[in-house]
Design a protein with these regions (language model features):
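N-terminal low-complexity or simple alpha-helical regulatory segments
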Residues: 1-85
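Extended mid-to-C-terminal alpha-helical interaction segments
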Residues: 132, 136-206
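Hydrophobic alpha-helical core bundles mediating ligand binding, dimerization, or RNAP-core interactions
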Residues: 20, 62, 106-109, 180, ...
Length: 206
């Protein structure tokens, strides 16, 4: 059977990384990670979708994501508290991918915060350990300067942990939720195009 058409098929973390690398090579554009991360915010499944849409507070959503993220992805997250701040540290199974993983995750995270929270928190700092192609594009998308340091992390004020989402139920029929669960036609068309590319890459690499 063609794994690209099998909705029950699973892939290993290494296969996932290989597929992502192949997709990046096929696309060849420096904003690939940004576009892929934003596309993920329209996927109505997974721990991130349900955690950020259905948890009672942002703190609960983060803890749920930390607890289960590593079970289904080639990276894991650690939370560190320091005074009035908290940091999310991202670690990839392949160390050379950790900085890209952090930027990809932050683009996704900030978009999910905009979707799910009336007053989404602004990062205090974003740090990476290694250069990433197209870094200026990521900074523009995230609206935050990225600095180089000893970790791949994002920092927020602890006050953000108590924020409540627009709706506790992911499928509550409010305008904001409908926009999220049912993307507009333009986004749907973009998603279909990306889906075709992904299927082609999966077929060639697995």
């Amino acid at each position: 059977a063609n794994i690209a058409e099998d909705t029950k098929a699973t892939v290993s973390a290494e296969q996932f990384v290989r597929l992502f690398e192949s997709a990046y090579q096929v696309d060849g554009r420096p904003d690939f990670g940004i576009r892929a991360a934003l596309t993920y915010t329209h996927v109505p499944c997974g721990i991130g979708f349900h955690a950020f849409g259905g948890s009672p507070t942002l703190g609960d959503a983060i803890e749920l994501t930390i607890k289960y993220k590593g079970d289904i992805a080639p990276e894991y997250i650690k939370r560190l508290d320091e005074g009035e701040f908290f940091e999310l540290h991202y670690h990839h199974e392949r160390e050379d991918k950790s900085s890209f993983c952090l930027l990809f995750a932050v683009v996704w995270l900030l978009e999910m915060l905009k979707i799910n929270y009336k007053n989404p928190p602004t990062p205090v700092a974003i740090t990476i350990t290694d250069p990433v192609p197209g870094l200026l594009l990521y900074e523009e998308q995230m609206g935050c300067k990225v600095t180089f340091g000893a970790s791949n992390s994002i920092r927020f004020h602890k006050s953000a942990l108590s924020l409540k989402p627009l709706a506790a139920d992911m499928f509550t029929a409010t305008k904001d939720r409908n926009d999220f669960v049912n993307p507009d036609k333009a986004n749907a068309e973009k998603g279909a195009q990306l889906s075709d590319v992904i299927k082609s890459i999966i077929s060639k690499n697995l």
